[in-house]
């Protein structure tokens, strides 16, 4: 039974069929597959091209959580050298698409993917979050689950914006947030961990009730990580990854980060 609005401006809703709306978009790939891949090596880091993760068994990963390079000319990006740095934004998106496609291949049925991105520029502004959403939803046909606004800081302090001050001539919005885009592979629910041994058993959840209520809000207030303390120009905080792990994985699940950066995901996995 669906719902519909009986007339404009009236809150009563009844008998609405939304299939026409959803039929306008590329359909996601829904699957009843509940076969989990064999577990590969754990607690290991591979150095290589994330577009080829053949060392990780297909269908073995419960959660991919990552923060791709920002395409902002950071030192860790340019240090990769000629031939390894995308020449332009379109090439950058192509690289992201290739890595995310390979990441999705490693996900088990119902496995989740959480991608942390910062939007780019002000003249003009570019929504990297929108482009990543298009990749996940339209190109890879994953099931989009939502978008979290990561609130890094509040108030008048923090980032600068070189626009007009106290004037409508050219005020510029200051970026105090990033996004975490969440999708799942083929189905909305998780497959029982026992499917690897032919037994239908659920895993052990680790998220406390109070944290679950906060984590299921679409705004997360988590302080940014110090680049100086971590020794990396653009680290994302361990607390952000820990929240993803608590919310989307069972104890003993396999987690993958194709852009390892400063090792935040590995630290969070060990902590939880």
Q: What spans do the regions from the language model cover?
A:
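Core catalytic lobe of class I
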Residues: 1-272
């Amino acid at each position: 039974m669906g719902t519909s609005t009986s007339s404009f401006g009236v809150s009563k809703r009844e008998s609405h069929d939304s299939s026409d709306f959803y039929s306008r978009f590329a359909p996601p790939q829904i699957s009843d597959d509940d076969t989990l891949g064999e577990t590969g090596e754990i607690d290991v880091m591979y150095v290589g091209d994330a577009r080829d993760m053949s060392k990780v068994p297909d269908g073995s990963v419960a959660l991919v959580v990552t923060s791709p390079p920002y395409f902002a000319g950071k030192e860790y990006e340019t240090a990769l050298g000629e031939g390894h740095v995308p020449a332009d934004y379109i090439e950058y998106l192509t690289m992201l698409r290739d890595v995310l496609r390979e990441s999705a291949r490693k996900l088990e049925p119902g496995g989740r993917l959480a991608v942390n991105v910062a939007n780019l520029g002000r003249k003009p502004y570019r929504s990297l979050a929108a482009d990543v959403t298009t990749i996940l939803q339209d190109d890879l046909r994953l099931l989009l689950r939502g978008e979290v606004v990561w609130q890094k800081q509040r108030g008048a302090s923090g980032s600068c914006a070189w626009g007009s001050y106290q004037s409508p001539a050219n005020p510029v919005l200051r970026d105090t947030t990033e996004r975490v885009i969440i999708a799942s592979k083929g189905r909305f629910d998780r497959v029982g961990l026992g499917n690897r041994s032919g037994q239908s058993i659920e895993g052990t959840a680790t998220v406390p009730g109070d944290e679950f209520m906060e984590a299921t809000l679409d705004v997360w207030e988590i302080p940014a990580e110090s680049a100086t303390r971590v020794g990396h120009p653009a680290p994302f905080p361990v607390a952000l990854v820990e929240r993803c792990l608590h919310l989307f994985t069972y104890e003993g699940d396999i987690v993958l980060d194709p852009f390892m950066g400063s090792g935040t995901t590995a630290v969070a996995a060990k902590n939880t």
